[in-house]
Regions:
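Ribokinase/PfkB-type carbohydrate-kinase core domain
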Residues: 1-91, 123
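Conserved post-catalytic alpha-helical subdomain immediately downstream of the catalytic base
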Residues: 68, 72, 96-147
Length: 147
């Protein structure tokens, strides 16, 4: 992974990563923290993952951390929606309501895909959040991780 990061950085590309798994974050916390602080430009995490990463108890601590590292941190919060923090710019979106949730498999991945689709197409942050929410809302209403 280090060579891939080095190559992307050398080519002036943005590097995005999802923390993806609470167990991995807890087990490899210091490695993840180094990546988040020093190697990544865009970080995706759910609320539990970001709190575990920084040993925080409150969501306000996660927001403060995200502002301090000066990266684009996107945190999904389930029924509370999602938030993007990039230095002092904070954008939030509510979760869609009245969904028939069947399976959460792939929700974070599809959210990240939608958000990144917005980034590469020069959407503003709010529209990136909307696209991510749109895709994740579709996948959780099906069994399995394919739309």
């Amino acid at each position: 992974p280090k060579r891939a990061f080095d190559k992307a950085i050398a080519n002036s590309k943005k590097v995005a990563m999802s923390l993806s798994d609470l167990f991995c974050v807890e087990r490899h916390r210091l490695n993840f923290l180094e990546l988040v602080k020093n190697r990544l430009d865009i970080i995706f995490a759910n609320e539990q993952e970001i709190l575990s990463l920084i040993n925080a108890k409150t969501f306000d601590e996660a927001i403060s951390f995200s502002k301090e590292i000066k990266k684009n941190v996107i945190i999904t919060r389930g029924e509370k929606g999602a938030i993007s923090i990039n230095q002092n710019e904070i954008s939030e979106i509510k979760a869609k309501s009245d969904l028939k949730i069947k399976d959460l498999t792939g929700a974070g991945d599809l959210f990240a895909a939608g958000y990144l689709h917005g980034v590469i197409n020069n959407f503003d942050v709010k529209d990136c959040l909307i696209k991510g929410t749109e895709l994740s809302s579709k996948i959780i209403q099906k069994i399995g991780a394919r739309i």
